[in-house]
Design a protein with these regions (language model features):
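Short, small-residue-enriched loops and turns at beta-alpha junctions
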Residues: 38-41, 120-124, 155-156
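Active-site-proximal loop->helix
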Residues: 75-136
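Positively charged, low-complexity intrinsically disordered leader regions
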Residues: 1-63
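Single conserved hydrophobic/aromatic residue that forms the stacking wall/gate
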Residues: 157-166
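Fold-independent oxyanion-binding glycine-rich loops
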Residues: 13-14, 33-35, 71, 96, ...
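Phosphate-handling active-site elements
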Residues: 56-65, 87-94
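Conserved beta-loop-alpha segment that forms the PLP phosphate-binding cup at the N-terminus of a helix
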Residues: 45-53, 67-88
Length: 166
């Protein structure tokens, strides 16, 4: 029986699928990457894993530490899935306009949700900006570290090793 030693080992290495109609219409082989095969069913699982691994490598996060992110999308799910499997707590700051299904899914994955009013980014209480301040506050008292994942500005997203992972 084959098995993965841990959930994070299932992130990436997703298969390629030949897109038959597109291939026939173009005369080229067109392939799609099956990112839905990641544990959180999204390409954002990759970003989550690399952000977390980067924080661990830099000594900013140890098991039991806290990952904070402001997100209305799949990054929160990726951070919750991968973070929980690696022994981290996840706090997601989310606009109160998001669907109940998304909120329920995040909670089922173990994330703590902080719901804030949906306001423009220029407002200091925008969910992304709020999450940065919250991460800084949590970091002051978390003995195992706390990070702001900061998906929108994280340089780990554009580093050479990340871009070429399969």
């Amino acid at each position: 029986m084959q098995y993965a030693p841990a959930l994070e080992h299932l992130v990436g290495n997703t298969p390629l699928i030949k897109l038959q109609n597109a291939s026939e219409e173009t005369g080229c082989t067109i392939l799609g990457k099956a990112e839905f095969r990641n544990p959180g069913q999204s390409v954002k699982d990759r970003a989550a894993l690399f952000i977390i691994k980067d924080a661990i490598a830099k000594g900013m996060l140890r098991p039991g530490g806290v990952i904070v992110e402001g997100t209305a999308g799949n990054t929160g799910i990726g951070l919750a899935v991968v973070g929980a499997s690696m022994g981290f707590k996840t706090v997601i700051v989310i606009p109160d306009t998001q669907s109940q299904e998304k909120k329920d899914a995040l909670r089922l994955l173990g994330a703590q949700l902080v719901e804030v009013p949906a306001v423009p980014y220029k407002n200091p209480n925008n969910y992304v900006r709020y999450s940065g301040r919250l991460a800084a506050e949590i970091a002051k008292t978390s003995p195992n570290g706390a990070i702001w994942a900061n998906q929108f500005l994280s340089l780990i997203h554009i580093s050479e090793p990340t871009r070429h992972e399969s």
